[in-house]
């Protein structure tokens, strides 16, 4: 319960007691502003506390008290039957009757209902304390000097000390040091009654110097107003440890043991009210734990930060109880409707399994990943309203950018995620097609996927991490997308990485282009060699298919048809070959040069005696060596020079000297080429 609801409860209670002056009294209480804790305590406190506050407010506003009700003269109710008194099971003290705190007591009535004590002393220990209880019938005299901490006047010292005590209550087990009591207060005057002594108005006090064990908690709702008396022998709440099988406190436990239905009659609250009390108690404790270190920064315990795990555990337990209550309610409804299948489905799991509890602590199991078009116009509220059909939605996160195409939805229970994924795709939100995918934490991707990614994506960052890895988006995106500064930093980082990648890609392209240029240069050299090989493979004379006596290919000399020029052509062949060998093969070894010279000499020595004689076997081998070694040189020189050319086709006309064979038997092309290249006589044309 928050302060707003507590204020409404207090106003309704004041209006029930004094409807004429309720608005003025409530206005004064709001103007004084004693804090949310005091308002909540007043909302759940006994009527004696409320009467005291109203009496003090009427005194300050100079208002007349309302006429007493007819039942005010009734006898006092024993403490054992008062519904507003505290009770604890197995407290070790028997019940002791005491007057009701609503009675108009004498100045010694403070002894029967001591509000300020922590030692839980008996009535005999506090008899004789002459303090006065403020009540509607006794609100004058010295009441302002002994005002409760809710009042601003006459109780400033009390108020400061009480606030100090509330801040220290959770930092020390046994209270403060007994050697430093509060000045102005006796230990005997600051005792609160035990469980059966009738005091329950102010559950906190100043009895630190009494040596008794101090309460470590402030006035929680479950200790103020909803418990049976100590004579009943039980409290209002069952023991959870005993229900699970074993309670370490044994008979001294403050909660109920056993399955007796009569022992649970003191539980006057339903489950919703109990959860509100637990939440309120948790909030009060956390607030006091925050105030304690702030009030005493130099204390040994004040500098210790609060444990965040305790708050997480409390909230998780509250969620677990709420889920269990919802399942019980659903099972009860299914039983009432007569559906056994539905009842079995809900009753099969009365509590959360350990796996489900772990999944509750892990937000990844309660999230889904959404993808949708960039031109979608729906908002986070629309997404939350749509998916609330399947279950309660905890959070919706859609990145704030111009072209949004993904988002995340977090649910309260992981079962909702399973239900949505089982339904399949697509989903339509505001006429936009939305696809749902399971949420995967990129930090837990198997190694094989990382290896594949490392093979196909180059590492570009100096730290060795791939900037294109979506680890940043999913692992840190939940927090980074919520803050614009972090989003800008992430965008700048990605831009820098993209520029780095572009620069490295450009360098790779330039390096590849250089390699291609080198390959092209090598290709030009290879083309020259290929041209030589092609010239070698050309067949100069080819036989006529029909046995014609005229060859299809002849060798011609374009110089004038005199014998001197033809002889000069032979010398040109040798000079050209020498020039090619000398200019193109400068790095040729001496052995290769001598080999070429020997081949030429052997060729000259193997010339036949008569030009009309057929070549010998030795000359044939020499001719073969000549053709294999020097044909490329001749072909290359013939391409560049204008003296010798090779023409194909039949030449029927005159004007060109033809080398005609003497008979119809056409020699082999190798022999013909060897003989035709050998011009040793002064004749114009030599016929075979």
From Swiss-Prot:
Listed Basic and acidic residues bias regions: 574-589
Name of this chain's protein: Zinc finger CCCH domain-containing protein 22
MF terms in GO: DNA binding; RNA binding; zinc ion binding
Database matches in InterPro entries: AtC3H46-like_PABC-like, AtC3H46-like_RRM, Nucleotide-bd_a/b_plait_sf, RBD_domain_sf, RRM_dom, Znf_CCCH, Znf_CCCH_sf
Record's keyword annotation contains Zinc: yes
Keywords: Coiled coil, DNA-binding, Metal-binding, RNA-binding, Zinc, Zinc-finger
Species: Oryza sativa subsp. japonica
CDD domains with a match to the protein in the record: RRM_AtC3H46_like (cd12458)
């Amino acid at each position: 319960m928050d302060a707003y609801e507590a204020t409404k409860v207090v106003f309704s209670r004041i209006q029930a007691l004094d409807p004429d002056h309720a608005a003025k009294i409530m206005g004064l209480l709001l103007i004084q502003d004693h804090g949310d804790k005091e308002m909540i305590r007043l909302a759940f406190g006994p009527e004696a506390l409320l009467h005291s506050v109203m009496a003090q407010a009427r005194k300050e506003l100079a208002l007349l008290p309302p006429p007493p009700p007819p039942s005010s003269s009734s006898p006092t109710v024993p403490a054992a039957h008062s519904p507003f008194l505290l009770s604890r099971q197995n407290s070790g003290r028997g019940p002791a009757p005491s007057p009701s705190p609503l009675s108009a007591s004498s100045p010694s009535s403070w002894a029967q209902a001591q509000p300020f004590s922590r030692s839980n002393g008996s009535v005999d220990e506090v008899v004789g304390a002459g303090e006065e209880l403020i009540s509607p019938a006794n609100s004058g005299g010295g009441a302002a000097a002994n005002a409760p901490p809710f009042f601003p006047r006459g109780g400033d010292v009390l108020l400061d000390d009480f606030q100090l005590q509330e801040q220290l209550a959770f930092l020390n087990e046994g209270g403060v040091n007994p050697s430093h009591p509060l000045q102005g207060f006796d230990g005997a005057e600051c005792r609160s009654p035990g469980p059966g002594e009738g005091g329950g108005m102010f559950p906190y006090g100043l009895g630190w110097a009494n040596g008794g064990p101090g309460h470590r908690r402030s006035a929680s709702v479950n200790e103020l107003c909803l418990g049976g008396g100590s004579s009943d022998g039980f409290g209002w709440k069952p023991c959870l440890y005993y229900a699970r099988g074993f309670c370490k406190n044994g008979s001294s436990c403050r909660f109920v043991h056993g399955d007796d239905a009569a022992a649970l009659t003191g539980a006057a609250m339903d489950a919703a009210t109990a959860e509100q009390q637990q939440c309120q108690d948790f909030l009060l404790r956390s607030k006091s734990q925050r105030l304690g270190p702030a009030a005493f920064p130099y204390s040994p315990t004040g500098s210790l930060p609060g444990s965040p795990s305790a708050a997480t555990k409390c909230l998780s337990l509250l969620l677990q109880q709420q889920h269990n209550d919802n399942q019980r309610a659903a099972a009860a409804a299914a039983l009432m409707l007569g559906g056994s299948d539905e009842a079995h489905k809900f009753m099969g799991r009365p509590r959360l399994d350990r796996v489900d509890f772990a999944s509750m602590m892990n937000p990844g199991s309660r999230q889904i990943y959404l993808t949708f078009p960039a031109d979608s116009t729906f908002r986070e509220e629309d997404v939350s309203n749509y998916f609330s059909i399947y279950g309660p939605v905890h959070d919706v996160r859609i990145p704030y950018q111009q072209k949004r195409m993904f988002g995340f939805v977090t649910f309260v229970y992981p079962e909702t995620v399973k239900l949505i994924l089982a339904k399949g795709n697509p989903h339509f939100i505001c006429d936009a097609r939305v696809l749902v995918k399971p949420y995967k934490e990129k930090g837990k991707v198997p190694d094989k996927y990382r290896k594949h990614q490392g093979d196909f994506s180059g590492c570009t960052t100096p730290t060795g991490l791939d900037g294109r890895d979506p680890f940043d988006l999913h692992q840190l995106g939940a927090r980074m997308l919520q803050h614009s500064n972090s989003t800008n930093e992430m965008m700048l980082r990605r831009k820098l990485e993209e520029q780095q990648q572009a620069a490295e890609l450009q360098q790779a392209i330039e390096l590849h282009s250089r390699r291609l240029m080198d390959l092209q240069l090598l290709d030009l050299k290879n083309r020259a060699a290929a041209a030589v090989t092609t010239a070698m493979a050309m067949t100069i004379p080819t036989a006529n298919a029909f046995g014609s006596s005229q060859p299809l290919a002849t060798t011609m000399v374009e110089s004038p048809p005199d014998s001197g020029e033809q002889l000069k052509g032979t010398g040109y062949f040798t000079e050209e070959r020498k020039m090619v060998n000398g200019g193109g093969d400068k790095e040729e070894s001496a052995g290769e040069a001598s080999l070429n010279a020997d081949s030429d000499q052997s060729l000259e020595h193997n010339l036949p005696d008569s030009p009309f004689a057929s070549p010998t076997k030795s000359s044939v081998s020499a001719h073969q060596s000549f053709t294999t070694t020097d044909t490329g040189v001749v072909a290359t020189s013939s391409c560049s020079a204008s003296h010798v050319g090779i023409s194909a086709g039949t030449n029927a006309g005159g004007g060109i000297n033809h080398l005609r064979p003497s008979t119809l038997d056409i020699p082999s092309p190798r022999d013909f080429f060897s003989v035709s290249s050998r011009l040793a006589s002064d004749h114009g044309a030599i016929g075979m």
